[in-house]
Design a protein with these regions (language model features):
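PLP-dependent amino-acid enzyme catalytic core
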Residues: 1-106
Length: 106
């Protein structure tokens, strides 16, 4: 199976940090944190990793616009818009839900 082409948008690999104090506090474990906040993009690591493949496919097919859908608070939609802007593609978001402020909780 051939791996699909991807664009390089994120700064990878990101660091893996040993959380020494938490590991010590929990005892008998080593806790590590993958620092995908260090990708150098406006979006989180798992979103940009997926988009590197999707955007490469769009460009390879001659598309100039990305279209995606999600809820009004969708991190995926935000990530798609940011990545499209960075690459120079247009982006249309189809958002569902209310854009009005709904106050909940404490």
């Amino acid at each position: 199976m051939k791996m699909p082409r991807k664009l390089t948008i994120a700064n990878l690999p990101t660091n893996i940090e040993h959380l020494k104090r938490l590991s010590s506090e929990l005892g008998n474990v080593d806790i590590y944190l993958k620092r995908d906040d260090q990708t150098g993009t406006e979006v989180s690591g798992n979103k940009i990793r997926k988009l590197e493949f999707a955007i490469a496919e769009a460009i390879d097919n001659g598309y100039d616009t990305l279209i995606t859908c999600g809820a009004v608070q969708s991190n995926h939609a935000r990530a798609t818009a940011a990545a499209a802007a960075k690459i120079g593609l247009k982006c249309h978001l189809i958002l569902r839900g209310s854009s009005e402020d709904v106050f909940e909780g404490n």
